[in-house]
Amino acid sequence: LTSHSVTLVYMKSYMVQQKSKTALDQVKQYHEQTKHEFNRYARSLGYLDWANQPNPFRRFDGAPLIPLPHLTLDEDPLSPSYESLFHPHSIPSQPVTLNSLSRFFEYALSLTAWKAYNGTRWALRSNPSSGNLHPTEGYVFTRSLDELALEPGLYHYAPKEHGLEHRWALPPELAQSMLQGIPSEGFLVGLTSIHWREAWKYGERAFRYCQHDIGHAIGTLRIAAATLGWNLLVLS
């Protein structure tokens, strides 16, 4: 009984101590704990557990997959020049169709190549990632659009198949009300992180790398949008 009492008191004291810290204090503590020093690296696992390597591709059981058309060499309209991406309104805005949405994701989050070595095969993607671990997942939330052959709702982008998994179907009226304030021809893109994909290699620094990867994904999404004459606005 004494042992249990001591444990409970200790845990209670620890919890009170944690609650007394502000969110900023916790952030500072995390960064202090996980930073590299001039004379040493931050703590890490020290090895890679290959038997438990995370799956780099997320799929949802039972979710219908809508294939997206891949880009072709004679794609119309042709991809604009790199310089023109930095001149607002120089690229005509394309309607939101299945083809343009496909190009958007292919430029931003898709697979770009496969590599193989000693019997191991892995993919490269258009968005850079620390350790090529790719914790970032992309989603699109849309209402009924005149030229977009998709039901209103939430979709998950599956890069391996280059398709959209239908995750949540919504009545058109509800989808419209949920997207109030978004331009009539606009849609929402969401990004999430699977932290285990990073923690498997980088341990407690994984949260840092996940935020870094989100930044890379926002960058490629912004460039992909610009090639279509679209404007990407980061909400949160």
Please give the residue ranges for each predicted region:
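N-terminal accessory segments that position/regulate proteins before the catalytic core
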Residues: 4-236
